[in-house]
Amino acid sequence: MDQLMAMRAFTRVVESGSFTRAADSLNMPIATLSKLVKSLEAHLETRLLHRTTRRVVTTAEGMEYYEKVLRVLIDIEDIDTAFRASCCTPKGHLRIDVGGSTARDVLIPLLPDFFQRYPDLRISLGVADRPVDLISGNVDCVIRGGPLDDSSLIARHIGDARMIACATPGYLKTHGIPAYPQELRNGHKLISYLSPVTGRAFPFRFLEQGEPLEISVPHHLGVNESNAHLAAALAGLGIIQTFGYAARAHLKTGALVEILSDWRPKAYPFHVVYPQSRHLTHRLRVFIAWLAEVFPAAVKG
């Protein structure tokens, strides 16, 4: 038995909750992975996992073993990284998840610089506004805006985006330009961004004399994807509140006009996030370091 590989197979099953997903993430047949875990249990003379037709449950002994093995694997990864980083260019495959407008307007335009620096790295980019499960979703990290509330994740702040309210000149000519946020309640057509998770509309947020102000009214149109949300505004359907970087090009051409600029809310924080349990490989380290260098100016908008 290759004990190190068996340990890696076991930890991946625990993290993903599935033999199939674990095998896929390790690029090995499920039969091979299952044999490794069974050999590990036989070697330890301990049942680590309970298997049913629907799910895999970690035993108490299995969880204790997982926590100890994880530290060993992280130490091994750190040792390898320390020696490789000084003499080798990073190689391999990164799986990154990012929201739609952030991918289109910030990350993808920056990627030529990344690939010029690290030509031996490959990236699979998952683009969706709906958050992924970092443990079972088989991704190395995600780039997300907004507050973080999961203590099991490690987050690095990589910039702040300004939020703006805007509409087309045609819409504003027909409906008038609101002079202050409360006027949005007076007959204006609002295009709300809907949470991809809950379906609820996010309120329009502003600052009034330094204090947060939220405007929540029934929306004319609700959209749960950031690129479609912007497209609705460009179609003249109403007023949106969006990231400055998403509207930047359209503000320059005059296709959109910012309104209520004196009431802009606080900047929206962005983070790159990964699980505490995920081994921080050399390739992920260089990607995060690169993000920290180039992302803040691009996301600011």
Put a short name on every predicted segment:
Residues M1-S16, S34, M63-Y66, L70-L73:
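Short alpha-helical elements of helix-turn-helix
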Residues R12-N27:
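Short helix-boundary/capping micro-motifs
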Residues D24, A42, Q116:
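Alpha-helical residues within the helix-turn-helix
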Residues P29, K35-S39, L110:
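Residues within the DNA-recognition helix of helix-turn-helix
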Residues E41-A60, L256:
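A short LG(V/I)-centered, amphipathic sequence patch enriched
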Residues T53-V56, M63, I74-D97:
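Short helix-loop hinge/linker segments at domain boundaries
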Residues K91-I154:
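Central regulatory/effector-binding core of bacterial HTH transcription factors
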Residues V132-S136, L148-F270, A297-G301:
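C-terminal regulatory
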